[in-house]
Amino acid sequence: MTTYNLRLKAKSELTPHPTAQYWRKCQVEELFEMPFMELIFKAAQVHREHFDPQAIQLSTLLSIKTGGCPEECEYCPQSARYDTGLEKQVMMDVEEIVEKAKIAKARGASRFCMGAAWRGPKPKDIKVVSEIIGAVKALGLETCGTFGLLEDGMAEDLKQAGLDYYNHNLDTDPERYNKIVHTRNHDDRMDTLGKVRHAGLKVCCGGIVGMNETRPERAGLIASLANLDPQPESVPINQLIKVEGTPLENAEDLDWTEFVRTIAVARITMPKSYVRLSAGRTSMPEAMQTLCFMAGANSIFYGEKLLTTCNPEEDSDRLLMDKLDLYPLAYEPSDA
């Protein structure tokens, strides 16, 4: 098996943009420690250097194969190792997926993300999802897939099928990775990210906060993302959704200001990435989401489901966007 570890920036290596430097963990911690209002202001300034602050990229996420995953990730209700009441479902039919994609596009989504609960796909699975990707791409939607660990050649096959993005999150601080995930390691994730980059796919890579981590550990997650070379085009920041039956069902609540800080620090350290306000929005008041947008979040998952958990209804999202004079970003082939 060929190993394609995604290269990290060397400590002495600086890119032409001053904010694309190597980020030491202590530097990221210093950002977290800034006075709240100063941090939000700094993040907003960085955001405006690279994006229209009123434009929001809308993605819809669909679970095309649900439950029964052999992995043991303490946050995930789809693991076969936990009794969460989730019923295992086989792969959806192509026609049903395409119909869901048509609905998503009609409602304003520009990107359609598809997830399958596998440790990694088999060659026969790649053939099936390649057909699905081609059908969704033909609708004029940007495509994203999250299918787990990839073997050699699979990323190239997905690229050939028309996939734009591959989602593969780093989940948490590398130093605590195996406290949360017990059936793979951080290097496994980096290997697949390397395969994805080698194939010419764009990268969607983020993590989850609210899993009883400390602030320095949140800084470690952001540093590990910011030091990917090149940086991810999309960075989803998820707030843990506590699901009964998972080991993290009783995790301590993360203070809302700490989540907003995480969004702001992600924006400052990854100035050209789309920072996605992802899972956990059903528990976020409008004012909190507004602060996240001010701090540089410029993408959301749009639709009533995020794989197996609830998401705000489309109508409530559009109402909030109208209140804030935000508008959905249209998909163009050259967009990140």
From Swiss-Prot:
Q: Does the keyword Iron-sulfur apply?
A: yes
A matching Pfam family? Radical_SAM
One BP term from GO: biotin biosynthetic process
How many cofactor units bind, and how? Binds 1 [4Fe-4S] cluster. The cluster is coordinated with 3 cysteines and an exchangeable S-adenosyl-L-methionine. Binds 1 [2Fe-2S] cluster. The cluster is coordinated with 3 cysteines and 1 arginine.
Q: What class of enzyme is it?
A: transferase
Keywords, ordered alphabetically: 2Fe-2S, 4Fe-4S, Biotin biosynthesis, Iron, Iron-sulfur, Metal-binding, S-adenosyl-L-methionine, Transferase
Write out the residues that bind [4Fe-4S] cluster: C69, C73, C76
Q: Where is the Radical SAM core domain?
A: 54-281
- What pathway does the annotation place this protein in? Cofactor biosynthesis; biotin biosynthesis; biotin from 7,8-diaminononanoate: step 2/2
Q: Which reaction does it catalyse?
A: (4R,5S)-dethiobiotin + (sulfur carrier)-SH + 2 reduced [2Fe-2S]-[ferredoxin] + 2 S-adenosyl-L-methionine = (sulfur carrier)-H + biotin + 2 5'-deoxyadenosine + 2 L-methionine + 2 oxidized [2Fe-2S]-[ferredoxin]
Q: Which superkingdom does the taxonomy of this entry point to? A: Bacteria
Gene Ontology molecular function terms on file: 2 iron, 2 sulfur cluster binding; 4 iron, 4 sulfur cluster binding; biotin synthase activity; iron ion binding
Binding, [2Fe-2S] cluster? C113, C144, C204, R276
What are the names of the required cofactors? Answer: [4Fe-4S] cluster; [2Fe-2S] cluster
Q: How does it assemble?
A: Homodimer.
Into which family does the record put it?
Answer: Belongs to the radical SAM superfamily. Biotin synthase family.
What does the UniProt record say this protein does? Catalyzes the conversion of dethiobiotin (DTB) to biotin by the insertion of a sulfur atom into dethiobiotin via a radical-based mechanism.
HAMAP family per the record? Answer: BioB
Protein known as: Biotin synthase
Lineage at the top is:
Bacteria, Pseudomonadati, Pseudomonadota, Gammaproteobacteria, Pasteurellales
